[in-house]
A protein has these predicted regions:
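DNA major-groove recognition helix of helix-turn-helix/homeodomain DNA-binding modules
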Residues: 59-76
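Phospho-regulated, low-complexity intrinsically disordered regions of nuclear gene-regulatory
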Residues: 77-83
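A short, Lys/Arg-rich alpha-helix, primarily the initiator
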Residues: 1-25
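Short alpha-helical DNA-recognition segment
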Residues: 26-50
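Helix-turn-helix DNA-binding elements, focusing on the entry/boundary residues of the two helices
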Residues: 18, 29, 45, 60-63
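Residue-level detection of the helix-turn-helix DNA-binding "recognition helix"
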Residues: 23, 37-38, 53, 82
Length: 83
């Protein structure tokens, strides 16, 4: 059986980490999307919102832009959140 969602129904496992790191940098979703666009990734505020909420899949190519934009590594994006 092929499973493409997390146990809580999310379409990605790093959206919550992306949101936390973005907030720690005091970036709005719009400002983060703008930063990614300047780096060459075609995303908008709505795409960021859907990634962070788990409604959207995130490709490895997108992660290769997102990680440096958040001053982190792709590996760190997959680390569990400390609650």
């Amino acid at each position: 059986m092929f499973i493409n969602k997390t146990v809580d129904g999310r379409n990605n496992i790093c959206g919550l980490r992306i949101a936390a790191l973005r907030r720690s940098l005091k970036l709005s979703q719009r400002a983060f999307a703008d930063k990614l666009q300047l780096m060459g990734l075609d995303v908008d505020k709505n795409a960021i919102q859907r990634m962070e909420s788990g409604q959207r899949f995130i490709t490895d190519i997108e992660l290769s832009y997102i990680a440096p934009a958040l001053n982190t590594t792709m590996q760190e994006l997959f680390a569990p959140l400390d609650h």
